[in-house]
Amino acid sequence: MGLLFNVEDFNKVVKEYKLTSLYNKSDRLCGDADIDNYVVVNDVNCAWEYWFAALLAQHRMNRKTASSRDGAVAAEIINAITVVKDPTRMIVKSEARKMPMRYAVGELLWYLSGSNKLKDIGLFSSAWERMSDDGETVNSCYGHKIQHFYGFDQWQDVIDRLKADPNSRQAVIQIKNPRPMSEPTKDTPCTLSLQFLLRNGHLNLTTTMRSNDVWTGVPYDMFSFCSMQVMMAMTLGVDVGTYTHQAGSLHIYERNLPAGEKDPEGNNETQKPKLESGVQESSVKSNK
């Protein structure tokens, strides 16, 4: 696989940013940190702290950026897989990342409403305005994609499938729809699909993403999808199983690097993101 990041740098980041969930080795059950793009953790907070530390450690090792349509990418781990053992512990509460719960809950409610209206999510963040193609609707409207976009309610379809066949491998919700390059958009959904697997009385969920920004995406995505997993388990009357989060590209943008992560030449002028960041920077997912 090759070296993703250096163990020494990883451990330094953990201490410098007080990523306390990683102090306890039982919270991170994978293997050696220098090759891992797969991690098993107890909760979402530990998941976020692990990937934040991994990306900063990789940036310290490489000191390179790559261009993208949404800005310079400071570090990237491809095919990053996270297994969360307890999805009911779904809130990022790290010292390095104060998660604005007003926005997180607002985004979840927007999904559950089935709305694709910019004005509805705009109640919680104006950042979505720059992502709308028509100034009225949003493409990354996961709730609308789940309930309305494909002509039937995918949420209810999953319920029906799992009630009819608890061992079904077809309880899948499709989020991203194909779109030709000749039809450009400002807003391409980062989430591809959600698959619910009911095994041994426990409902497991696997989310597959094409792209995920560790700063503005991961905290809110995991919060929303773990919440949906718990809701589905309650509806079916079963226990909550594990949550698996797969990202083709997991990354952090240069603009979101903490101030102390400047490159040796001093060319990196990014500022440390505000920990109490409010909603303006919160969750614009389309080009992550």
Please provide the spans of the model-predicted regions.
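Terminal, non-catalytic protein-protein interaction segments that mediate quaternary/complex assembly
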Residues: 2-288
